[in-house]
Amino acid sequence: MEKGYMISDASKMLEVENHVLRYWEEELELPIPRNELGHRFYRDSEIKLLRTVKDLKEQGFQLKAIKKLLPDLERVENMDPQMLYQLREELNGEVLREAMEHARGDRKSVV
C-alpha cells in the first residue's frame, strides 16, 4: 500500500486541527482516500493540496473561492502576489454576490 498519513499526522504536518481537515474535505468536495478500515488516508499529493488550501486561506481566500480555483490550483500556486491579490478580490466578491442573491431569493419565497 502507498505511504500515507492518518488525519492526526496530517493535521500536525499542516498545523491545523483534525476538524478543519474534515471541514475542508466536505466543503471543497475533496476525494480523500480511505484505508481498509475506512479511515482517511492522506498521501503526499493530498498533503500538498491541503497545504495550498491553507496558504490561500491565510491569504484571505474564502473556501468557496478556493473551490472555484481547484481545477487550476497548480497555475495559482505560481502566480505573482499582485495577480493573486486581484484574483482573491474578484473571487471573494463573486462569492459574496452569490450569497446575497441567494439570501434575496430566500426572502422572496418567505414573503
Residue ranges and their predicted role:
Residues 1-71:
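Basic helix-turn-helix/winged-helix DNA-binding cores
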